[in-house]
Design a protein with these regions (language model features):
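Bacterial N-terminal signal peptides that target proteins for export
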Residues: 2-13
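Short, compositionally biased P/S/T/A/G/V-rich stretches that sit at domain boundaries
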Residues: 28-58, 62-64, 137-139
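Short, aromatic- and glycine-rich surface loops/edge beta-strands on solvent-exposed regions
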Residues: 109-123
Length: 139
């Protein structure tokens, strides 16, 4: 078995270092910076004192991670998934910035639990989660 000359091993070190330095910024491109912050809070609408079936809600949204934040809202009655909706919280978003808590799957007289997710879509169309919050919905 032939032994490699030692200078070849040392010659590879700068090549490996150069590759690492070139690829690391690419690997992290498009990801939010460590200094970003996000918050999400529930806002009841139409004079409501609690979130309720067929009631309207919206959210106070704040983030430095993107200028096109979305809120995805999912609700369950027990283990049954009953509601799934998405709203953009930016000026040219397609729909109104509120949710009406109702669907054909939503059973009357049964309380629900909802989880809101603040996120954005990266350049590849993947959702990037910023924060979440959960809240009960009265029957």
């Amino acid at each position: 078995m032939r032994k490699r000359p030692p200078f070849l091993s040392f010659a590879l070190i700068p090549v490996i270092v150069a590759l690492v330095l070139a690829l690391v910024p690419t690997a992290f491109a498009g990801k939010p910076g460590g200094g970003g912050s996000s918050s999400l809070s529930l806002v009841l609408m139409d004079g409501a004192t609690q979130a309720a079936h067929n009631g309207r809600i919206t959210f106070n949204v704040s983030t430095t991670a993107t200028d096109r934040p979305f809120v995805g809202l999912r609700c369950w009655q027990g283990t049954t998934w009953i509601y799934d909706a998405y709203v953009g919280y930016f000026p040219d978003a397609m729909f109104d910035p509120w949710f009406t808590l109702g669907s054909p799957s939503w059973a009357d007289g049964i309380a629900a639990n909802c989880t809101a997710r603040l996120f954005y879509y990266d350049r590849r169309g993947n959702q990037k989660l910023l924060t979440t919050m959960s809240f009960p919905v009265a029957q």
